């Protein structure tokens, strides 16, 4: 089941949920954002009414994260095999955040990427493959996901590793320019809906304590 087993939910005590809520859901940790034809004063009053009962500060202090490698396998009676390979990434305030985003786009961001061309188009080993870069306050994950069949997984994993290793040798100017253009286009497309705009504003305020101009983001990508 997508949401977990009933036995897991039954094993969670009510007090545990309440303590988690008190620790994580506080006024200092929440950003409420809106985009579009919004009356600011009305919006502020609605937000205050909805969240006025929250405590000002949370009571939980998160421990710093430490990356550690490992391997996890889960056997199921399925025809498909899902493979995820993760490496230590970087925090969202790291100066290399945008270069990492460009690198992820080059490696596995779409049909023109290295992973798609080599592993799906040329070798036909997967039905889906892409890279991802997830950044957090004090670290991150850079990885690759692939969906394949049981008979292909043994050949697939070494090829995935090889494509990641190739990033350390050389990157052509043409594919670098293509990755930058693709990432810039995707970034600009987030401005086309009010939902995406409000989500972006909230995320930037929570991370950087300011709204980052789109021109600044594009400049970092370039």
Feature-to-residue mapping (PLM):
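Charge-rich, well-structured scaffold segments of protease-associated domains
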Residues: 1-58, 62, 73-74, 78, ...
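His/Glu-based metal-binding/catalytic segments typifying zinc-dependent metallopeptidases
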Residues: 59-114
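Generic alpha-helical structural context detector
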Residues: 104-108, 117, 162, 203
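Short amphipathic alpha-helix segments
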Residues: 114-122
């Amino acid at each position: 089941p997508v949401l977990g087993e009933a036995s897991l939910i039954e094993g969670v005590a009510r007090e545990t949920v309440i303590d988690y809520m008190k620790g994580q859901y506080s006024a200092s940790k929440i950003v409420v954002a809106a985009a579009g034809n919004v009356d600011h004063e009305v919006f502020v009053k609605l937000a205050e009414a909805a969240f006025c009962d929250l405590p000002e500060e949370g009571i939980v202090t998160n421990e710093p994260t430490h990356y550690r490698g490992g391997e996890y396998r889960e056997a199921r009676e399925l025809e498909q095999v899902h493979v995820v390979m993760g490496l230590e990434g970087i925090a969202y305030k790291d100066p290399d955040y945008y270069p990492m985003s460009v690198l992820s786009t080059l490696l596995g961001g779409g049909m023109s990427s290295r992973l798609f061309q080599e592993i799906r188009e040329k070798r036909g080993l997967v039905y889906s493959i892409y890279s991802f870069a997830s950044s957090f306050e004090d670290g991150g994950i850079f990885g690759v996901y692939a969906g394949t069949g049981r008979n292909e997984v043994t050949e697939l994993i070494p090829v995935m590793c090889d494509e990641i290793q190739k990033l350390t040798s050389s990157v052509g100017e043409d594919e670098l320019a293509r990755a930058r253009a693709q990432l810039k286009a995707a970034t600009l497309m987030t401005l086309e809906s009010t939902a995406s705009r409000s989500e972006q504003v909230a995320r930037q305020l929570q991370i950087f304590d300011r709204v980052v101009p789109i021109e600044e983001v594009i400049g970092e990508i370039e």
